[in-house]
């Protein structure tokens, strides 16, 4: 019933208010112009209509740009702080407890510079006195083919504060890789003095270059032969450093006596060695004369120079750490002797060295057959210690369910053991 009444209402509504999607009629009234032929009368057009026509024609003539530029991300000015950079000469005052506000707008003096700002920059005064790079007026090099050998050092002359002459020795660019041989100056008449004149380098610096050319010549042929022979002979050291006595070297091992692998680690006796303090040796410096010296010179005696004791760290009590060898076992496929360090000698400590603390190692039953008992070493000590042996408790032989016998002093999980009653 509801569906029928709804259909009736919809049909009535379409008759009364049909759904017509048409552009709405414009309510703008246009002036109707009545034209008559052969009438010499000017048509009356209202001023309001003239404005509308002019606006319409202007819209048609101009091209409309949808977007002139690419979209830009707006800069977030809110919350930004401007860092104040005061000009040189402005005192910066710090008031404790008072927060500095944001930079205010520039004053009139900061926007407009002084009238003679160019003269100030040229004379390097006021704000141009510091932190400004000097303008170079010329980069002329009067000696382009020469390279400096010595640094340019000033010559201090008393009484002349303004003039400060400097001296620098130059050499031809081609001879900089050659061996510098001793040279002698020729006669004084060959020296040439050339004045390059005064030249302004910077607005406040002028340089007057005076070149003094001194020709040089090599020494005699005998001296050249000596230099050539010295150059061809092999180089020999003239200073030798050696020890007056051999340094003492002590070797440390793990600190545990060689014993069977299947013994409990608590039964093995640790050994500690007290390291001896090394006496500082006296170093001898031997000075020798070279073989190619003059034959008239006598051989210089050997000078013994005693060097003071070398300050070093106090030696460790237990020896170097690289003498600690871990307890390891080879795979059954490897047949090699176990590396054992030499037996230590010296005092025996109560607790043993720190390098004797090793965890207990237990092997899988498949590796038991590859381990053999180490042969006891002969002790080189003159004094023997009496060892008290206690009878071990009787333990039934243990084996796995497959029949492999296990050592008696190692505890296994009950799930893999099989003991015969």
UniProtKB/Swiss-Prot annotation:
A single Gene Ontology CC term: host cell nucleolus
GO biological process, one term: viral release from host cell
GO molecular function terms noted in the UniProt entry: DNA binding
Record organism: Canine adenovirus serotype 1 (strain RI261)
Protein keywords: DNA-binding, Host nucleus, Late protein, Viral capsid assembly, Viral release from host cell, Virion
Protein name per Swiss-Prot or TrEMBL: Core-capsid bridging protein
More details: All late proteins expressed from the major late promoter are produced by alternative splicing and alternative polyadenylation of the same gene giving rise to non-overlapping ORFs. A leader sequence is present in the N-terminus of all these mRNAs and is recognized by the viral shutoff protein to provide expression although conventional translation via ribosome scanning from the cap has been shut off in the host cell.
Induction: Expressed in the late phase of the viral replicative cycle.
Oligomer and partners: Monomer. Homodimer. Exists in equilibrium between monomers and dimers in solution. Interacts with the histone-like nucleoprotein; this interactions bridge the virus core to the capsid. Interacts with core protein X; this interactions bridge the virus core to the capsid. Interacts with the endosome lysis protein VI; this interactions bridge the virus core to the capsid. Interacts with the peripentonal hexons. Interacts with host NPM1; this interaction might play a role in virus assembly.
Family indicated by similarity: Belongs to the adenoviridae core-capsid bridging protein family.
Regions annotated as coiled coil: none
Family annotation (Pfam families): Adeno_PV (PF03910)
Listed HAMAP family: ADV_CORE5 (MF_04053)
Role: Associates loosely with the viral DNA to form an outer shell around the nucleoprotein-DNA complex and links it with the capsid by binding the endosome lysis protein. Dissociates from the viral genome during entry. Might be involved in nuclear capsid assembly of the viral particles through its association with NPM1/nucleophosmin.
Location in or out of the cell: Virion; Host nucleus, Host nucleolus
UniProt cross-references to InterPro entries, sorted A to Z: Adeno_V
């Amino acid at each position: 019933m509801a569906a029928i009444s709804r259909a009736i209402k919809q049909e009535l509504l379409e008759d009364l208010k049909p759904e017509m999607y048409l552009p709405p009629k414009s309510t703008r009234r246009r002036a109707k112009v009545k034209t008559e032929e052969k009438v010499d009368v000017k048509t009356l057009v209202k001023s309001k209509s003239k404005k509308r026509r002019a606006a319409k024609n202007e819209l048609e003539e101009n091209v409309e740009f949808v977007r002139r530029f690419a979209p830009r991300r707006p800069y977030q000015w809110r919350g930004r702080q401007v860092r104040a950079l005061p000009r040189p000469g402005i005192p910066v005052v710090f008031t404790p407890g008072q927060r500095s506000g944001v930079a205010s707008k520039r004053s009139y003096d900061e926007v407009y510079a002084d009238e003679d700002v160019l003269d100030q920059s040229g004379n390097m005064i006021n704000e141009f006195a510091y932190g400004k790079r000097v303008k170079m007026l010329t980069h002329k090099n009067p000696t382009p083919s020469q390279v400096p050998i010595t640094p340019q050092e000033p010559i201090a002359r008393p009484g002349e504060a303004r003039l400060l002459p400097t001296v620098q020795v130059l050499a031809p660019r081609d001879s900089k890789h050659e061996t510098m041989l001793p040279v002698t100056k020729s006669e004084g008449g060959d020296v040439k003095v050339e004045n390059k004149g005064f030249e302004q380098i910077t607005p406040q610096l002028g340089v007057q270059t005076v070149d003094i050319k001194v020709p040089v010549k090599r020494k005699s042929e005998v001296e050249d032969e000596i230099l050539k022979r010295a150059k061809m002979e092999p180089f020999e050291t003239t200073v030798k450093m050696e020890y007056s006595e051999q340094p003492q070297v002590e070797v440390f091992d793990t600190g545990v006596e060689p014993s069977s692998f299947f013994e409990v680690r608590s039964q093995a006796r640790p050994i500690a060695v007290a390291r001896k303090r090394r006496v500082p040796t006296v170093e001898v410096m031997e000075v020798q004369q070279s073989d190619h010296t003059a034959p008239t010179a006598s051989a210089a005696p050997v000078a013994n120079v005693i060097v003071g004791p070398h300050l070093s760290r106090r030696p460790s009590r237990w020896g170097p750490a690289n003498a600690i060898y871990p307890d390891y076992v080879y795979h059954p496929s490897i047949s090699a002797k176990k590396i054992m360090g030499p037996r230590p000698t010296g005092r025996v400590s109560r607790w043993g060295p720190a390098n004797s603390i090793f965890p207990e190692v237990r092997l899988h039953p498949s590796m038991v057959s590859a381990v053999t008992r180490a042969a006891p070493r002969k002790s080189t000590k003159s004094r023997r210690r009496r060892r008290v042996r206690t009878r071990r408790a009787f333990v039934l032989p243990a084996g796995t369910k497959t029949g492999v016998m296990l050592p008696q002093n190692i505890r296994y999980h009950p799930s893999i053991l099989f003991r015969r009653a």
